[in-house]
């Protein structure tokens, strides 16, 4: 199973933007507690929320799918 590091990426992007969890929560209309749970990995981030956060931070998000050459890994 693949694991993602969305929580770590989110923390990094907030630091790079100089924003606090409280500030981003206010900007996207969610609670500080919710953002905190996401960044600590205690709650799965919803795609809609992730997209709002990345939009506020000035990022375009692209999702790509690439077919594996080795089908035995599926």
PLM feature spans:
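Helix-turn-helix DNA-binding elements, focusing on the entry/boundary residues of the two helices
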Residues: 21, 32, 47-50
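DNA major-groove recognition helix of helix-turn-helix/homeodomain DNA-binding modules
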Residues: 48-63
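Recognition helix of helix-turn-helix/homeodomain-like DNA-binding domains
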Residues: 29-44
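A short, Lys/Arg-rich alpha-helix, primarily the initiator
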Residues: 1-17
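Short, charged recognition helix plus adjacent turn
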Residues: 64-74
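Short alpha-helical "recognition helix" segments of helix-turn-helix
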Residues: 24-25
């Amino acid at each position: 199973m693949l694991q993602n590091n969305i929580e770590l990426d989110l923390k990094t992007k907030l630091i790079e933007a100089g924003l606090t969890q409280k500030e981003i929560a206010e900007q996207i209309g969610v609670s500080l507690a919710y953002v905190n749970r996401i960044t600590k990995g205690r709650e799965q981030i919803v795609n809609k929320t992730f997209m709002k956060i990345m939009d506020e931070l000035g990022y375009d998000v692209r999702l790509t799918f690439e077919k594996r050459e080795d089908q035995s890994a599926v």
